[in-house]
A protein has these predicted regions:
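Histone-fold recognition with a strong bias for associated Lys/Arg-rich disordered tails
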Residues: 1-162
């Protein structure tokens, strides 16, 4: 059973997803932050399989947030810019959805020859999510065909390459 994150998966969790949470002003690290973190390296196997840019994903997530607030009568422009959130040292608290993605990524990585959890295992875990999860809603909004992404990941090199 895989027990360690690959270097790229560790960077995803400890740096990129945390950076996305901080950038968005969120106090907890969620599935949407993990998805955005996967898109930081547009040349990675996970990002190529998704076929979505980081800029497009950020814009779509911002639009989803604005729409949710507008549905209850709040206009985001009236709120102004919030102060950046500081997590101090270490990882911000994980949402329950993000914790579930970690468990699922471990399950996805079990058959791995390398014994490591790769970024593609996180992507496979994120693809299994359903609405109302934020990452699932973002994937749907971006028009990501989950079956096609899974096929791309199952191609040469399987889910092992980051």
């Amino acid at each position: 059973m895989p027990k360690r994150l690959s270097v790229d998966a560790r960077k995803l969790v400890l740096t990129l997803a945390t950076e996305e949470a901080r950038r968005r002003g969120d106090r907890r690290l969620g599935t949407d932050h993990l998805l955005l973190g996967l898109l930081h390296d547009g040349d990675s196997r996970a990002a190529k399989a998704l076929g979505v840019s980081l800029a497009d994903a950020r814009a779509a997530l911002d639009a989803l947030d604005r729409a949710a607030l507008a549905a209850v009568g709040i206009e985001i422009q009236a709120l102004g810019e919030g102060a950046p959130v500081s997590f101090g040292r270490g990882l911000p608290p994980l949402t329950s959805g993000a914790r579930a993605v970690f468990r699922r990524a471990i399950d996805e990585g079990r058959p791995s020859r390398s014994g490591r959890i790769e970024t593609t295992h996180f992507l496979l875990a994120l693809l299994s999510l359903q609405r109302p999860d934020p990452a699932a809603e973002l994937l749907d909004t971006l028009g990501v065909d989950r079956a096609v992404v899974r096929q791309r990941l199952a191609g040469p090199a399987g889910g092992e390459a980051a």
